[in-house]
From Swiss-Prot:
Name of the protein this chain belongs to: OPG024 protein
Gene that encodes it: OPG023
Family: Belongs to the orthopoxvirus OPG024 family.
Phylogenetic lineage: Viruses, Varidnaviria, Bamfordvirae, Nucleocytoviricota, Pokkesviricetes
Span of the signal peptide: none
Biased composition (Low complexity): 23-34
Compositional bias per record (Gly residues), positions renumbered to this chain: 49-64
Annotated coiled-coil segments of the chain: none
Length: 64
């Protein structure tokens, strides 16, 4: 359901998968609607972590 969250949900998902270290999860980011993540697995993870930490963690923590 988090995938339907949009930008916030997308970053949140990116941070979770990125932290897990599963490159396969990069495909999940594309489903969220963030083509940037799908553009590059390595680059996407790094960018996702930075963006996720700043926005995803705050929003995600509340949802958890």
């Amino acid at each position: 359901m988090s995938s339907k969250g949009g930008s916030s949900g997308g970053m949140w998902s990116v941070f979770i998968h990125g932290h897990d270290g599963s490159n396969k999860g990069s495909k999940t980011y594309t489903s969220s609607g963030s083509g940037m993540w799908g553009g590059g697995s390595s680059s996407g993870v790094k960018s996702g972590v930075n963006g996720g930490v700043n926005g995803g963690v705050k929003s995600g923590t509340g949802k958890i």
